[in-house]
Amino acid sequence: MHGYLPAVGFALRGEGASIVNTLESRLHVVWYAIIHGANQRDTIAPEFVLTAFIFMTEPLARYQARIETALSCVLPPAGERLADAMRYATLGGGKRLRAALLYATADDFGVPPDSVDAAACAVEAIHAYSLIHDDLPAMDDDDLRRGRPSTHRAFDEATAILAGDALNTLAFALLANSPLPPATRLAQIQTLADAAGWAGMIGGQMGDMAATGKTLTLPQLQAIHRGKTGALIRAALHLGALPATDYAAHAATLDELGEHLGIAYQIADDILDATANSATLGKTAGKDAAQGKNTYPALLGLDESRAIFAEHSARAQAAAARLPHGAPHICALLACIIHRSH
């Protein structure tokens, strides 16, 4: 391990900080109106709308900067082929939404960010490893990831497989060596292992592959994505809140939030795959349809997919509102996730 993680601090400065502090409770109304195109936004003062926009977008950039710095510190130094492949796959762009959700949850639960840096890096390491393996010829066979060649194309298949394996094990080493109390570390390890394993992300990927070329029902499709996509999103929320003293009282609500957010995120991903181009997505567009994958647009059409997306987005927002202080940091990220373009 190359030291631990540096203390990296970010904050709103000047008038922006005081505006957000005084208007935080009102921003929920503002961003909800913006998201849903509600008529009431016409009656909201322009400075509130501007503040809401800043409030929605600034946290994501702040969390992205923090996780990039942290990841660069915990990955092995460049210079050897395996280390280079690990860094290529992990540091090569990406939205960092899982790490951002983890940090946002920690913020809303009053958990210092430096105490969850290890967990944020662990989630991103697991996500990067899953993308490496998903892109392999034996699985999704995709040559493009995050706007550049997939890891197995930039290096070779054997190196890509080993880089994914190394990132998988690194994730749990980070959690085991974090500065949190042993009981919390153990709970985080168990949470991530369950999310990434046979009953979570890996099981969902297996179900997705097994269902290729078949027609599924909506519950069957959602069951696959509950593991493939949703498990790691739910884990990120729990990992950020686990160090908090009031975690247990809100665990069920975090599950509910993660459930609906995971489904909404996957529907958005499917819609983008069907409607956006490769340059926008940073990966091969239209690949799901070409491979006979089960997607929401393929099963339901775009209009019905968008309707179900809106339903789960609203239910995610409602769950977040029941978290401590209305979870303003999580809510701000939900707005970014709901309106993502890639």
Regions found by a protein language model. Give the residues of each.
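Short, Lys/Arg-enriched N-terminal segments with co-localized hydrophobic residues
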Residues: 41-55
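N-terminal polybasic/positive-inside topogenic patches
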Residues: 11-16, 22, 45-49
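Mg2+-dependent prenyl diphosphate-binding active-site environment of isoprenoid biosynthetic enzymes
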Residues: 59, 63-65, 72-319, 328-338
